[in-house]
Design a protein with these regions (language model features):
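Intrinsic disorder/low-complexity signature
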Residues: 26, 36, 82-83, 91
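Anionic, Ser/Thr-rich low-complexity intrinsically disordered regions
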Residues: 69-86
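Short beta-strand or tight-loop elements
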Residues: 22
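Acidic, low-complexity, intrinsically disordered interaction modules
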Residues: 25-68
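Short intrinsically disordered terminal tails
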Residues: 1-2, 89-95
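Negatively charged, low-complexity tracts enriched in Asp/Glu with abundant Ser/Thr
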Residues: 1-19
Length: 95
């Protein structure tokens, strides 16, 4: 399983530790206008510009095995590890 968090374009974090399962990515059906699905480890955006929580849910629910394998492969790259490290440094200095 891959963790995601969902955030709006204004950067407000809505859901943390979202797993790719047949579950919803809105919090209790409360959906803001536009969503971004982001890999929670590195901060890489997986998909941007989904207009509703329902669209967001459908996108995640229908991620193909190939897409999941591609994300898992990306997580093994040096670029990915650097992004994770950069995100952790940013969190330490901004949160």
């Amino acid at each position: 399983m891959i963790d995601f968090y969902i955030r709006t374009h204004s950067g407000i974090q809505i859901v943390t530790g979202y797993k790719i399962t047949k579950s919803y990515c809105c919090h209790k059906d409360t959906c803001l206008a536009r969503w971004t699905i982001t890999d929670s480890k590195s901060g890489f955006a997986i998909q941007k510009g989904l207009k509703t929580g329902k669209e967001c849910f459908e996108y995640v629910k229908n991620l193909s095995d190939d897409m999941i394998k591609a994300i898992e492969k990306e997580r093994k790259t040096e670029r990915y590890q650097k992004a994770c490290d950069d995100l952790e440094k940013w969190k330490e200095s901004n949160l």
